[in-house]
Amino acid sequence: MGTAKVTTPLVFAITIATIGSFQFGYNTGVINAPEAIIKDFLNNTLREKSKSMPSEVLLTSLWSLSVAIFSVGGMIGSFSVGLFVNRFGRRNSMLIVNLLAITGGCLMGFCKISRSVEMLILGRLVIGLFCGLCTGFVPMYIGEISPTALRGAFGTLNQLGIVIGILVAQIFGLKLILGTELLWPLLLGFTIIPAVLQCAALPFCPESPRFLLINRKEEERAKEILQRLWGTQDVAQDIQEMKDESLRMAQEKKVTVLELFRAPNYRQPIIISIMLQLSQQLSGINAVFYYSTGIFKDAGVQEPIYATIGAGVVNTIFTVVSLFLVERAGRRTLHLIGLGGMAFCSLLMTISLLLKDNHTWMSFICIGAILVFVAFFEIGPGPIPWFIVAELFGQGPRPAAMAVAGCSNWTSNFLVGLLFPSAAFYLGAYVFIVFTCFLVVFWVFTFFKVPETRGRTFEEITRAFEVQVPAGSRAEKGPIVEMSSIPPSKDAV
């Protein structure tokens, strides 16, 4: 196997793909800053149409719907990943669904001038559909075009795109920029620009060579793309691995979502995938950002929004740190470190929140705990769940697995957003004890059940899971080895 290099075509393709990740992050964070302004828009529009003052309950319900409908769209979109990637390919799927981003951006951008609450809500739903699809497309594409030795580092770029998107949304949402009564439609409609940029650039990116060889049987084209992307002529071993997987796929029946749970050789990796996604959303990261503005204010920070943006900067910096660590320390190790550090910080936040009224210096302890909590999140639970799912499955079950994992992430995100305000109201600072318990459970699960995938090919990882499956239950028989016994590929050394 030739030594793969970081080439310009590879960096270009991954950068263009992560525009989809940026879109997800941007549209997640963009709705928060102009909350009061959008509520005024809802109030004025409803009053004009009904000729009467809308109730506070109706306004709150419409605002909540505007926020939550994004996650509903994400759930539907993420579950539809397989419908696109198997038919159109990875690259073409990313290209096609930008129509949703442009449509959603137009609906939101023109809702004010049209005096239409319905356009705002529909736009959020459509952009949610788009982002849900992107959470499947982007990690899958990056994982399939990256050399084995760099797959984790490049996979982390998906999360980097997300956190940069959130940070840009926070900055653009400032009153000095687009967070004003006049310009907030531009803030929401900005999502059109990255969509158009990605549409213009994607035709210059290659299709996934794994898709071309395994799904389309285009071996020569796949070989040519691999050589160009990896900067080496010696890709014979990688091509052979894909051909072996293609033969393996031909011997198995088509993998559906139900088959992932029924087939013994898929059951363990899909459970791991779901648990890793839950470890991200149930870690308490959204709760920390929910509390952060108030905590910064209590600590005497004059403009808490800038401190929250500072937390977003920490978010971004430690995602970059994770990028350099993931191929050295490994996925499993970083995930364990992240979960353990977050559990400690969560406990520290509970104590400091309970004592800050009696001891003002405790507010600064809490701020420190928040920033370190965010740092630990981006070392492990932030980036790793997104790309490790693509590593745990072969070409056949991968689209269905990405759909299930993505849907579980979006669903848990939706439920946390729905239930957290009530939990915070009744439990106060003790709400972080709940997240601490979740973090401990996920740490134990990761320690005992999650394998290390660093430096291993897709074929090696897939084979390793079959060791626990009785021979008669496997979809296909063949040589099997323990996950712990697989040596990393030479590229990874």
Swiss-Prot record:
Annotated Gene Ontology cellular component terms: cell projection; membrane; perikaryon; plasma membrane
Membrane topology designation: Multi-pass membrane protein
Residues bearing PTM Phosphothreonine: 232
Record: glycosylation sites: 43, 358
Catalytic activity: D-glucose(out) = D-glucose(in); D-galactose(in) = D-galactose(out)
PROSITE patterns: MFS, SUGAR_TRANSPORT_1, SUGAR_TRANSPORT_2
Positions in the Cytoplasmic compartment: 1-10, 86-90, 143-153, 205-269, 326-331, 390-399, 451-493
Any one GO MF annotation of this record: D-glucose binding
Regulation: Deoxyglucose transport is inhibited by D-glucose, D-galactose and maltose. Galactose transport is inhibited by D-glucose and maltose.
PANTHER family for the chain: SOLUTE CARRIER FAMILY 2, SOLUTE CARRIER FAMILY 2, FACILITATED GLUCOSE TRANSPORTER MEMBER 3
Family note: Belongs to the major facilitator superfamily. Sugar transporter (TC 2.A.1.1) family. Glucose transporter subfamily.
Protein name: Solute carrier family 2, facilitated glucose transporter member 3
